[in-house]
Amino acid sequence: LTDTFTYTLSDEHDATDTATLTITLLGQDNEAPSATDNTNAVNEDETVTVTNGTSGVTGDVLINDTDPESDTLTVTKIKKSGGSDSNVSSGSSYNSSGTSVTGTYGTLTIGADGSYTYTADQDAADALDAGDTENDVFVYTVSDGNGGTDTANITITVTGTNEPPVAVDDTDAVNE
């Protein structure tokens, strides 16, 4: 962006001179990216994996995030809702140096590329009856690499399943 001004100087003897001042704006303020909440669902005894760029799957944390300058976005932090931030290693994916955070009903592992996996913890989810649902909520930070950041939630809905009873063979002896 360039702006030009013409100005005239004069002295006490009425002598004048005209010049031009040109101002060129070399940079602009970086605008922060916009992170959008994500959702996914899993049964209490399953794992859900979402890889970067998977279209049509709600949960890929970068595919629905935007940046006004079209900067490349990365995930830089993750935490359980209400917990403390954990840094996410740059260049990582969920299965290669990803950062793991334990929630109430399972563990989320996320990479800087936005890919993640959530593994439900069977023992933690045993309290859920068949068909009952509870949410595990995580907060991630997305960065544009130029100082702009935003946060959004990853909400995993965990559904209880009906675990069949386990029969154990027994033996006993009785006197006649």
Regions found by a protein language model. Name each.
Residues 30-101, 163-176:
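Extracellular ectodomain surface segments
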Residues 1-29, 89-160:
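Acidic, turn/loop-rich segments in luminal/extracellular domains of secretory-pathway
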